[in-house]
Amino acid sequence: MKNYETYARKYPAIISMLIPAIVTTQILSSWFSQLQECWGTALSLIGVFVPIGVVYGAIGYFARQLFRDASKMFFQFPLFKEDETEMPTTKLLLWSSEKRLSANAIKTIATKLKEDFGIKLLSETKEQSNLLEAKKTIVDGVGKIREVTRNNPNLLQYNIDFGFCRNYLGGAVYSTSFLLIVLFVNILGVAGDWKFTLIALVFQILLAFAVFVTLKSKGYSYARALFNAYIGNTEYNW
């Protein structure tokens, strides 16, 4: 759990503050032209960036829960629903889902859930008449599966991969908002170069989009690994 907290929550929060730190460095360094003449451009930029980077890194570190909440609100819930009925873990166990596991795998998991926790997944026939109940039953079962596989070392990396992407996107919401405000200030002529900020903003959006595109696939990889850890206690290799 300590590794998850570090790699899936702290690191993405800190990394999401990198571009705002660079833009802030550009603005402040433009005010210190005399410093650049004395130290040289590269050295002065480093001298300005280091303390700024530390400050923004600290902001990301302490705001990581806010970033996590934002990632759920803006990305996870729209994709998978707040009640988790559209999560990859649910889709893989639904008979009617195109992305479902093999019939044999679903039956194996269903049997084990009934034996371990008394949770009975709906049959293929019953699912057709009550899809919502089938989804909610799966969600209940998945919650139990997560509890018993929490310390599985092979599953941890898949969990970190998904958590990193999701939580980075939460930080990207705040950093993008910050860059939009800075761009507005630049255009007003108060401080900084609006072209530099615009480039940084576009790069931030493209980077966040690239991470967002991988979020669903990371979710399915984690879901398959979760079920494999539950029924076989081995690394996902389907």
Language-model-detected regions and their locations in the chain:
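Charge-rich cytosolic interhelical loops and cytosolic tails of multi-pass membrane proteins
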Residues: M73-N152
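Extracellular/periplasmic helix-loop-helix junctions in multi-pass membrane proteins
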Residues: I187-L201, S217, S221
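N-terminal first transmembrane alpha-helix
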Residues: M1-L101, T197-I199, L215
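Cytosolic/matrix-facing juxtamembrane and C-terminal tails of multi-pass cellular membrane proteins
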Residues: M1-Y11, F209-W238
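Transmembrane alpha-helical segments and their cytosolic interface motifs
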Residues: N3-I19, V142-G192
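Single-pass alpha-helical transmembrane signal-anchor segments
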Residues: L201-A210
